[in-house]
Amino acid sequence: MVNVVLGSQWGDEGKGKLVDLLVGKYDIVARCAGGNNAGHTIVVDGVKYDFHMLPSGLVNPNCQNLLGNGVVIHVPSFFKELETLEAKGLKNARSRLFVSSRAHLVFDFHQVTDKLRELELSGRSKDGKNIGTTGKGIGPTYSTKASRSGLRVHHLVNDQPGAWEEFVARYKRLLETRRQRYGDFEYDFEAKLAEYKKLREQLKPFVVDSVVFMHNAIEAKKKILVEGANALMLDIDFGTYPYVTSSNTGIGGVLTGLGIPPRTIDEIYGVVKAYTTRVGEGPFPTEQLNENGEKLQTIGAEFGVTTGRKRRCGWLDLVVLKYSTLINGYTSLNITKLDVLDTFKEIPVGISYSIQGKKLDLFPEDLNILGKVEVEYKVLPGWDQDITKITKYEDLPENAKKYLKYIEDFVGVPVEWVGTGPARESMLHKEIK
């Protein structure tokens, strides 16, 4: 059994909390894409664990965790995150963590060129805006992967005669091509090389053939949960390109990032924030550049876990959610942070786009169009009630249930979980048929 948790908007929907809720039922949690450019916090017994690259399944002492071939790995950050989690009391994490031998490596010079590229792009753009990269080197690493010049985990840990020398030569060549492109930026190659010589020995025990790992688990009928990174609207193909990440963050990325066939997928859980946020630049049709946006930002504590950047806030965009549903095929939804809307008397939701008076049939691929659309809103009544202490779905205010029902009816997917507060137990389950 393979079930998948995916973000349906622009990220930061609260995927980690749902994964945390579910991991007790699973034998394996796997990540399939991205790197340490995303982040979420899980609270267990009053202890906060910040995850960026590593799977959230580490909070379950009986769960194995895999970084698949689609993930890009900055090895120093891998160990730093692991050590930070261990220092907070995470038990036997090292024996439960595995890394695909096919995953690509992120080097520090990828991070340097990430920022240089961002400056270059902002200088070229008409409005001076940049993509809003986290600066973690993710984009440049996927770029070297696509150009077939990147280095993978197996290149680093290979013990065969001459393998280390080949790694050094390829590493140096990769650095030189970056310097040819971006100038002679500061980078101590010899010091980094010495660091990686130590790290390769530390990394070896974690490395597995992830294809064999996954297929053996599937054959053994293990329960597997795939933890998606980022979200559909940041997908390299289906997101608001070019204001996207560099990987496939939808259901397609699950298959290619773990090497599993489509028929192995059972349930696909779409995580949806009860309003909409995004970090960085790019079109955002329902954004509220007013007191409503500020109120959502303040009550929702909308700051990025990885970057600390303030998130842009707006009303729930059902055009986005319907588009996301078409691509990912969600079998049920998790609506998060519903409590943030508690004090709003009226709650608009975006239900259609039009441009120059003409209604659009679907979410547009052209950002020149998307940036000019007018949003039609359906205004729903608020519930003006604190829902953070409610423990059963049935006890939610009627208007809160109507809000959720409107979402269900619009996208044609049932709501199965509802987040009503930051605590681990603040997640209501709704039976679905």
Swiss-Prot record:
The active site is at residues 12, 40. It catalyses: IMP + L-aspartate + GTP = N(6)-(1,2-dicarboxyethyl)-AMP + GDP + phosphate + 2 H(+). Pathway: Purine metabolism; AMP biosynthesis via de novo pathway; AMP from IMP: step 1/2. Optimum temperature is 35 degrees Celsius. Coiled coil: none annotated. Binds 1 Mg(2+) ion per subunit. Homodimer. SUPFAM superfamilies: P-loop containing nucleoside triphosphate hydrolases. This is Adenylosuccinate synthetase. It comes from Saccharomyces cerevisiae (strain ATCC 204508 / S288c). Inhibited by GMP. Inhibited by chloride. Inhibited in a highly specific manner by the binding of a 44-base DNA oligonucleotide carrying the ARS core consensus sequence. GTP binds at residues 11-17, 39-41, 311, 337-339, 419-421. Substrate binds at residues 305-311. CDD domains: AdSS.
